Amino acid sequence: MKTRDIKTKKPWRKVRPDGYNSHGSSMLSQLTDTPFDSINCDIVTQSDFIRELYPSGHSVNDPTIYPDIFREEVLPVLDDKGNDTGRTTKRLYREPVPRYAFAFQRMILVKHLVHLCGNDVQFELNSNKATDEEIEMFTKFRTGWLDKDMEVAFYESARSCKSTADTAFVGFLKDGEFYWKTLSFLNGDTLYPHYDTVTGRLKLFARSFSDYSEQGDEMVQWLEVWDERNLYRYRQGKGDGRTVKEKLLGIFGLSGYTLVEQRPHGFPFLPVAYRRDEDGPCWTFSQDTIEGYEISFSQMAHNNQAYGEPIMVLMAEGENVDVMKDMNGTIKSVSMGPDDKIDYLQSQSASESYMKQLDTQYKMIFSQSFIVDPPELKSGDLPAAALKILYSPAYEKAMTDCKEYQTFLNDMVAIFSFGYGVEVGSTLGFANLNMKWWLEPYVHVNSSTVIADLASAVQNGFISRQTASERIETLYSTNSEWDRIMREAKQQQEADLLYQLRVAEVNEPTNPTADK
């Protein structure tokens, strides 16, 4: 496959309302063909997603979308000596309007990540009677999962997908050790997945990134390509970063990528886990409401700026008013006649309907994103059931996310299982290990409640002590906690038996004729 074919990617789209309910009509008894209805879309890029993530890039800060106000001022025309000539001129000037952008997108991103990644990935042996060898291999696997920071890898991947709509996890071997990295548009990586049209599996993957000079100019553009066997690195110089060969090829119109490295990646399969969200980032369905809220709030701020302060009103006859101001133009004193009056027009308050609009927009931002704005608690801790109901929208969204990320997690586990197996010499043991793994949504529940529920379940015989030890692992215990419990129990049994033997020796009656 040529490099120009590799660097192809399906764009993200926003559906337009063109053609909605405009397909003609027919009689109920008349059979008609279904009309062709094409959906018109606006193309959006991952750069747009980053603009949405950072408040400085929001549309409310764009004067072409939310324009400033242009005003006209009448000024007297003065002569060379500064005297009024009686003529006037007009000056057009731009008055900047207040602009307020809020980081709702970051709030949504953080809350989604907490409920998706708040609990570690759950692992469990999928066999009724696990042997000691399987338990030892399972403990080694889970220890390596934590040693290699695979929980961090999953978090970084989820953060990338929920903010820029795609992500990739890549494993690689170097000098017999397993390493990994996450690829994201946030870090300057553009990802190009290519799938098998029959199986739907990833058959080729590419990553494009650039090197820049101190002045911010692009010097070199790199293209890394993975297939089932090899890793390819292509180079294309830009500007001053071009080599002599690239400059000569450019003269003849042959500029392009040059293969600089090709080597086996060491995996028997494509060591890339890729995920793409076709809807876009996690705040996509709230984006229009966020933009409307920011413009509405900015308009209210502009109204407060114009009418928020009391307005002084002078009621006098003639020109008997003398106003003294300081250097900043603030009125310090007013001199008037005995019959003149001064008063203030009180500032206008925002109407109830306008505040209702802002409040509704604010609530819909949270509702459309399935996040919860925690209310103020009047008294102590809430029970676990009440907390789950309170955070039910976020919990429901996390449940669907866990299902959607399961395929990505499967690929991550496969890459880690082989790569870390090569490092510790347990490739075959990990491959034969019969276990299952899944994501568990996080909900804000007091840890003491979880411990009490597990203790009650063990006491009533609902679950075993070993299962309870595995469930409580992320709180207080370790990967091999059940082995420690069994070892302590055996040591206690040995100590009790030794004590009983010593007591028996002390209490055993002696036979005085035995020595003779």
Where are these regions (language model features)?
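Extended, helix-rich architectural segments
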Residues: 1-185, 511-516
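Glycine- and charge-rich intrinsically disordered segments
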Residues: 1-10, 291-301, 305, 495-516
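Alpha-helix initiation and N-capping motif
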Residues: 47, 134, 138, 150-151, ...
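Short amphipathic alpha-helical segments
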Residues: 133, 137, 145-153, 285, ...
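Short linear motifs in intrinsically disordered
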Residues: 149, 155-162, 194-197, 224, ...
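Extended, regular secondary-structure scaffolds
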Residues: 156-274
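Extended, charged amphipathic alpha-helical segments
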Residues: 252-389
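C-terminal helix-loop subdomains that flank or include functional centers
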Residues: 318, 322, 326-334, 353, ...
